[in-house]
């Protein structure tokens, strides 16, 4: 039976929900005369639904009929799910109609491998040409590059889309070979390198010719699945740092694995997604991008998993407590960034303001410094530091100020650095949820205090 456009949209939008590499673009070019849509930053407001989908972009697959059989993917060819495929004209018209009704401000376009990577990419290119050339759509377009696509097609796509992305999916070649035998390291990193080189060449051309065509002006991103394979947090973070440095990625996205198939190579269907681990990876990724940390400083060979109770920055500060306190009126900018409670914006404010006069606690508070945490790591005018004192009482006081309160609503059973009774396990034994959270929190405080 022939599917209606709404049936296709329902199937293909649902099939795209597991791809998280979709956020605010960072692109900023205003609308041009005779076009519709704008990539101007204030107009790109991205809202997210409860399951993480971005609702201001039309986030959809062109097809979920896949020739690949990646075991972690809901759209793999061996899975019995409803299938659908848009024609290029259908998808282009749907995007324009949604835009005209103010439902969306752009398009996130991906696809399962319909036949071959090149055939799939050619169909995606047809959609982009219709939007850009026939409908004169000037809004934001993020296009997913299919591993194995020929360089010529990737080059064409880069001049039509604002951002490209090639998903790494799994953090090691061994896991790719085991869980996604149709993909390989070369088919992923070759297009990633091509996009990086073409983007740099485009930027150089623009310095010489202001009307030179732009290649993926919003850069490229990628996504890794966390928890489907045995790689450690340390391994994942090392890979992310390498991709940032080698390919100039704008963003690495991390997706906690949601079991979608009963496969002995994957976690069981009743396994909970490692959301806390995903959260810690995003926090560590932020340190790499904005706080001048190196991956080896956050995790190392001896500690390859994140602390479940402290965010990565606080954990580093606790492990290097001998470097503190620092005088905010004299400390280098790089050291200010490492103080818990001081972010890049407040660090810049401190650096600029201290040139005029010495700063005290009142000035720091107005600059956005979170003194609840920072007070144990700084000195300033009129303040010699909130020394926790010697003994267990002092260590507990600083621990309570630094500990992440959000972890206790989910439990920390996914990480084995400490071994407190997990919240969920206590609740299953009949302990009230709030009481279970308090018990786990107190145990965590004791563990961290001993570590200090």
Language-model-detected regions and their locations in the chain:
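Conserved Radical SAM active-site core
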Residues: 1-68, 72-222, 226-230, 243, ...
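A conserved active-site cap/scaffold subdomain adjacent to cofactor or substrate pockets
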Residues: 222, 233-255, 260-266, 275-276, ...
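Flexible, glycine/charged-enriched surface loops at secondary-structure junctions
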Residues: 204-212, 254, 294-300
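Long, highly charged, low-complexity intrinsically disordered interaction regions
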Residues: 265-337, 373-422, 451
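Flexible, acidic/Gly-rich N-terminal and inter-domain linker regions that tether
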Residues: 1-65, 370, 378, 386-452
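Long C-terminal interaction/binding lobes of large macromolecular proteins
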Residues: 1, 214-216, 234-245, 275-277, ...
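Residue-level signature of tetratricopeptide-repeat
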Residues: 353-354
């Amino acid at each position: 039976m022939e599917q209606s456009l709404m049936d296709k949209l329902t199937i293909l939008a649902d099939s795209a929900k597991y791809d998280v590499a979709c956020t605010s673009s960072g692109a900023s070019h205003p609308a041009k005369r005779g076009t519709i849509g704008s990539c101007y930053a204030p107009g790109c407001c991205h809202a997210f639904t409860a399951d993480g989908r971005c609702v201001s972009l039309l986030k959809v697959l062109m097809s979920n009929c896949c020739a690949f059989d990646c075991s972690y993917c809901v759209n793999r060819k061996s899975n019995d799910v409803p299938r659908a495929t848009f024609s290029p004209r259908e998808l282009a018209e749907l995007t324009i109609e949604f835009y005209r009704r103010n439902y969306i401000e752009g398009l996130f376009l991906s696809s399962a491998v319909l036949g071959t990577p090149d055939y799939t990419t050619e169909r995606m290119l047809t959609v982009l040409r219709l939007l850009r050339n026939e409908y004169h759509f000037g809004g934001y377009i993020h296009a997913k590059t299919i591993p194995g696509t020929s360089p010529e097609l990737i080059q064409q796509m880069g001049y039509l889309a604002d951002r490209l992305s090639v998903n790494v999916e799994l953090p090691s070649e061994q896991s790719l070979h085991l869980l996604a035998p149709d993909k390989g390291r070369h088919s992923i990193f070759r297009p990633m390198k091509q996009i990086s080189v073409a983007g740099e060449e485009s930027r150089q051309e623009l310095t010489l010719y202001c009307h030179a065509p732009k290649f993926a002006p919003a850069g490229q991103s990628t996504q890794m699945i966390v928890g489907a394979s045995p790689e450690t947090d340390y391994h994942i973070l090392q890979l992310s740092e390498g991709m940032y440095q080698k390919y100039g990625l704008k963003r690495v996205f991390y997706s906690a694995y949601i079991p979608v198939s009963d496969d002995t190579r994957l976690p069981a269907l009743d396994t909970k997604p490692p959301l806390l681990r995903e959260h810690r990876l995003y926090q560590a990724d932020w340190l790499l991008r904005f706080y001048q940390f190196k991956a080896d400083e956050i995790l190392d060979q001896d500690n390859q998993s994140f602390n479940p109770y402290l965010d990565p920055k606080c954990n580093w500060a606790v492990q290097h407590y001998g470097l503190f306190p620092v005088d905010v009126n004299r400390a280098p900018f790089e050291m200010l960034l490492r103080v818990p409670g001081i972010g890049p914006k407040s660090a810049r404010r401190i650096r600029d303001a201290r040139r005029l006069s010495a700063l005290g606690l009142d000035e720091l508070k107005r600059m956005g410094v979170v003194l609840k945490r920072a007070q144990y790591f700084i000195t300033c005018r009129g303040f010699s530091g909130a020394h926790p004192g010697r003994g267990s009482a002092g260590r507990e006081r600083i621990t309570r100020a630094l500990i992440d309160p959000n972890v206790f609503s989910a439990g920390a059973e996914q990480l084995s650095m400490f071994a407190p009774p997990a919240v969920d396990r206590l609740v299953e034994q009949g302990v009230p949820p709030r009481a279970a959270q308090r018990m786990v929190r107190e145990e965590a405080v004791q563990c961290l205090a001993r570590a200090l």
